[in-house]
Amino acid sequence: MSAAIQFIRGVDEEVIPDVRLTRAKDGSSGRAIFYFENPNLIQEGKLEVMGMYLQDEEGELTTLDVSAKFVNGKPHAIEANYDMKSEEEWDRFMRFMNRYAESHGLGFSKS
């Protein structure tokens, strides 16, 4: 099974997000900030987003911290925050991201 990101269950988002990661120095917590510029659901006029669902062979990671970004009164982007409160959650998230990158031909770089 490949990894997918969905805003509406059953509908994979095709736009690849910009993902920024932050992590506490002691590894006890972290945050992933996803930014989707002009995602499919905006292009299709579907703005009733209830959450972001990260799906892979291990199951599903979910966040409800999702918001639309507007330019000149029109939806332009979606930003979602996924918080990790333990090293185990961080490790699980990184496994998802590795699968997502692999299934979409992407790479990972530290900045």
Curated annotation (Swiss-Prot):
The protein's matches in Gene3D superfamilies, at most eight in alphabetical order, are given as: Photosystem II Psb28
Q: Which domain of life is it from?
A: Bacteria
Q: How does it sit in the membrane?
A: Peripheral membrane protein
Indicate the secretion signal residues.
Answer: none
Q: Keywords in UniProt for this one? A: Membrane, Photosynthesis, Photosystem II, Thylakoid
Pfam families reported in the protein's UniProt record: Psb28
Task: Determine if Thylakoid is one of this entry's keywords.
Answer: yes
Keyword Methyltransferase listed:
no
GO cellular component terms attached to this protein's record: photosystem II oxygen evolving complex; plasma membrane-derived thylakoid membrane
Tell me a GO biological process for this protein. photosynthesis
Which InterPro entries would you find in this protein's record? Psb28_c1_sf (IPR038676), PSII_Psb28_class-1 (IPR005610)
Q: Report the subcellular localization.
A: Cellular thylakoid membrane
Instruction: Name the major location.
Output: membrane
Q: Which family is this protein grouped under?
A: Belongs to the Psb28 family.
How does the record describe its quaternary structure?
Part of the photosystem II complex.
HAMAP family named in the record:
PSII_Psb28
Q: What is this protein called?
A: Photosystem II reaction center Psb28 protein
